Structures are given as structure tokens and as C-alpha cells.
């Protein structure tokens, strides 16, 4: 008879609680922990105060390629890659840290939530692992952005260098607020983050 380690179960519960607090859906919890579905349902209700949402996870790779979603998912993935390269940490921990960094640095929507939810961030990593999506460097700025895995690298221009016309209408930050945010990011990067 197989006996589960109490320490491993404790780590799984802690991980599940952290993922639930960040907005993870039940299939992610089942995939990343060894806890039973019934325990995860109870834990979800304890942490969130509501039952776990039902339904399928979003599964379209096209979502990550539209202009605003592409910028947000690329920012998250670049932070994730930096953490993987610099630190010797498990991928799930790198994902959580990169997502927390994304939440801290990227502006929230008017409804208060992030554009890139944790569920989509997790799915993005799965799409990249399965080589459905990948990264391509912009030929103008040199930044790495999410594209289809085998996108021709010599023609790609990112949404920053060539924004769609609707991008101007969606701007939520005033110039002063945007400049202040950029200044704060530069100060934080100079003080705390080693270059990747």
C-alpha cells in the first residue's frame, strides 16, 4: 500500500492555496499537485469562499497573438524565462513568481482584474512546451514576443513598433502616469533585478 508523504502533502496544499489565491482553476490544481479532486474542491471553497468555477479551460492559441494580449503574455513569458535562467527553481515556482511580477508591473483593466489571468499564463506555458507557440524577435526593437512557434523570424514587427489604430483609443494611463510608472520600473530594475 502506497503512503503519501505528509511533508509532500503539506507542500501541495501550500502550492494549491497560493495558486487559488492567484486565480487558478481546478484543472491547473489537479495538474500541479497530487491532491485529490475532492480535497481541492474543499480547499478552493475555504480559500475563495465560493465553489470552484466549472467549465473547460480556454484553449485558443490565437488569444495570445492579438495586440494587447500579446504584449501582456510576452511580458509574463520574458519574466518567466529570466527566472528560469537565473534561479534554480521548479517551473511552477517560476511561473508563480513571474505572474506576481506581471501583476505588479502591468496595468490592470478598468474592472480591476489583470488582462492575463493565471489560467491563461499557465496555458501559455503549455502551448510553448508543446511548440504550438514560441517567441520571435521584433526586427525593429529586438524585443522577444509570443508568436506561432515557427513564425518566420526576419519579418516580424511587434505591437509596440507597429500598434494597431485601435491601440490609441484604449490607452488608459495619462502621459504623466505612464512616465511615472516607467521611472518606477527603471528604479526597481536598477536596484533589485539582475539582467538576464
UniProtKB/Swiss-Prot annotation:
It comes from the Bacteria. InterPro entries: FlhC (IPR007944). SUPFAM superfamilies: FlhC-like (SSF160930). Its main location: cytoplasm. Transmembrane segments: none annotated. One of its GO terms (biological process) is positive regulation of DNA-templated transcription. Binds 1 zinc ion per subunit. One of its GO terms (molecular function) is zinc ion binding. Zn(2+) binds at residues 138, 141, 158, 161. One of its GO terms (cellular component) is cytoplasm. Pfam families: FlhC (PF05280). Keywords: Activator, Bacterial flagellum biogenesis, Cytoplasm, DNA-binding, Metal-binding, Transcription, Transcription regulation, Zinc. It is found in: Cytoplasm. Functions in complex with FlhD as a master transcriptional regulator that regulates transcription of several flagellar and non-flagellar operons by binding to their promoter region. Activates expression of class 2 flagellar genes, including fliA, which is a flagellum-specific sigma factor that turns on the class 3 genes. Also regulates genes whose products function in a variety of physiological pathways. NCBIfam families: PRK12722.1 (NF009365). Heterohexamer composed of two FlhC and four FlhD subunits. Each FlhC binds a FlhD dimer, forming a heterotrimer, and a hexamer assembles by dimerization of two heterotrimers. Belongs to the FlhC family. This is Flagellar transcriptional regulator FlhC.
Amino acid at each position: 500500500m502506497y503512503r503519501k508523504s505528509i511533508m509532500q502533502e503539506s507542500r501541495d496544499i501550500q502550492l494549491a492555496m497560493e495558486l487559488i489565491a492567484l486565480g487558478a482553476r481546478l484543472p491547473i490544481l489537479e495538474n500541479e499537485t497530487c491532491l485529490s479532486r475532492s480535497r481541492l474542491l474543499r480547499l478552493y471553497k475555504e480559500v475563495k469562499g465560493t465553489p470552484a468555477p466549472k467549465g473547460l479551460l480556454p484553449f485558443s492559441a490565437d488569444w495570445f497573438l492579438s495586440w494587447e494580449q500579446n504584449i501582456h503574455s510576452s511580458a509574463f513569458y520574458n519574466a518567466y524565462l529570466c527566472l528560469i535562467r537565473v534561479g534554480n527553481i521548479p517551473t511552477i515556482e517560476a511561473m508563480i513568481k513571474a505572474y506576481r511580477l506581471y501583476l505588479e508591473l502591468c496595468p490592470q483593466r478598468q474592472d480591476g482584474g489583470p488582462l492575463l489571468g493565471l489560467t491563461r499564463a499557465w496555458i501559455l506555458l503549455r502551448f510553448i512546451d508543446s511548440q504550438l507557440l514560441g517567441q520571435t524577435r521584433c526586427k525593429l526593437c529586438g524585443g522577444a514576443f509570443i508568436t506561432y512557434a515557427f513564425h518566420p523570424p526576419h519579418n516580424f514587427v511587434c505591437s509596440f513598433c507597429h500598434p494597431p489604430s485601435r491601440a490609441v483609443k484604449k490607452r488608459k494611463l495619462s502621459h504623466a502616469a505612464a512616465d511615472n510608472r516607467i521611472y518606477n520600473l527603471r528604479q526597481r530594475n536598477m536596484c533589485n533585478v539582475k539582467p538576464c
